[in-house]
Amino acid sequence: RPDQLSAALRERILETAASMGYAGPDPVARSLATRHSAAVGFMLGQGLSASFADAALSIVLDGLASTVDGHDHCLVLMPGRDRGGPRPETVTRAQADVVVAYSLPDDAPALTAVRARGLPLVVIDQPVLPDTARVEVDDFGGARLAASSLWGMGHRRFGVVTFALHPDGHNGLVTPARLASTSFRVTRDRLHGYLDVTGTDTPVWECARSSRELGRAGARSLLTSNPRPTALLCASDELAFGALQAVRDLGLRVPTDVSIIGFDDVPAAEHADPPLTTVRQPLAEKGRHAGELALRLLDGGRPGEPTRLPV
């Protein structure tokens, strides 16, 4: 109880502790005694290396970290492993007072583990869960805006390059049945936004993750089909960067031969060659809102209505 000590006595105690190499109470023991860890768990849908290569995720994470750090909380990262999310035992062992889930599939087992522990939960993007705090953007509206822009330019032959519909590692063309049963709300909404303008017969290439390498392969496959699309709608900027490379691989030019639109507006978009046209979503703001919701739940607040940010 340092408040009951004189300043001089407190200073002597601290000097003695420092000379003995005592750094203070053991954090694990302290958390057991107080039943609080001052930590926010962050559940990822993929491994750490893939996550840190995702520019959009990095910006969201920065917004979240800056918010909780300002209230003396730390972040505990729980990388995805099985079926698009952390293993349940990872969640069970994690020292966290509240959990933020980032883009997990609807049936991620990690979500059941969070509920079993009775921890407050905040969702960024997906899944949609009842009575759960959530931050999202208008994915359908943003995708529809992108497709409408290209339609207004006169394009009628489209191709779509998207990230995963299911956490099963599939790369290839999407069948109507696979589209109808997708496990990811964001993927579903963006595809519905695109196809609402271009038509349900538009070819859609699925990439197992949002990466330039897979976007390049998917775009190349679409651009070598007959008839060749004159416009590609990419569900992320990372996929769009890969599509730009595929266009160069085939000796084509943007926008003379093919138009490309991404989604995210990461900083690298304006430095691409040519600069990438993209749908902007407020990534840092999304992370900050999630952090504010997590802190509110820790203070006993209610989840409230989902927060939808404009694109």
Residue map of PLM features:
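A charged, well-structured terminal subsegment
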Residues: 107-112, 116-118, 152-155, 159-167, ...
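N-terminal helix-turn-helix DNA-binding module of bacterial transcription factors
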Residues: 1-36
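Short acidic capping loops at alpha-helix termini that bridge into adjacent secondary structure
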Residues: 156-157, 201-202, 254-260
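Alpha-helical recognition/docking segments in bacterial nutrient-uptake
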Residues: 35, 39-152
